[in-house]
Amino acid sequence: MQDHSYSFVVDATPPEVWAVFWGHRNHVVEHRVVRIEYLHWGDETGNGRIRHCRFPVPRYLLSGGVGRSWEWLTEVKPHESWRYDSIGKPLWSRATGWIRLEDLGDGRTRVHFRETYEAFNPILRALLERRVHRFISRDNDWYMKSAIERGVRAMREAR
């Protein structure tokens, strides 16, 4: 099993960061090479939200360099945290992730991210799991931070 964590600081309050993830009703969100399609919105807080994601994977997995995951979001605490569980392919796997927002004051938020990842097949787990997860995760912090900053900027400009 792989375990990947990082955190970063953005110049936005927790409610602003929250709104980037939870305040829109777009059915499809694209950020560079990542595409997220929302299939079900969940309850009023977003608990039970279901999404389908498309993202880059190594070409040697013979999927045209495209990975897919189906994710459901739970343990949603508005302006604080949420969890997701997912099933992904082409290296059939499961992942669990946690995102937590820490208010630093002065209009800044530290975003904490952690994900565990495990391939189902024990042979592929031994041969490919670490390499594939490293590839998938290598730019996650940059993608998430830049998406938040872009979203916050757009919300502020729209005011």
Language model region names:
Residues S5-F8, R68-E75, S86-G88, A95-D103, ...:
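Hydrophobic/aromatic beta-strand elements that line small-molecule binding cavities or substrate pockets
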Residues M1-G46:
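Hydrophobic ligand-binding cavity/cleft-lining segments
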Residues S63-G64, W92-T96, N121-L127:
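A short, polar/proline- and glycine-enriched secondary-structure boundary/capping micro-motif
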Residues D11-P15, E44-G46, T74-S81, R100-R110:
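A short, structured loop/turn motif at beta-sheet edges
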Residues T116-R159:
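A conserved amphipathic terminal alpha-helix motif
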Residues N26-V29, Y38-P90, W142, S146-R159:
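Glycine-rich portal/gate segments that line the openings of hydrophobic small-molecule binding cavities
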Residues M1-V9, I50, R68, S81, ...:
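Intrinsic-disorder/low-complexity, polar/charged segments enriched in Ser/Thr/Lys/Arg/Asp/Glu/Gln
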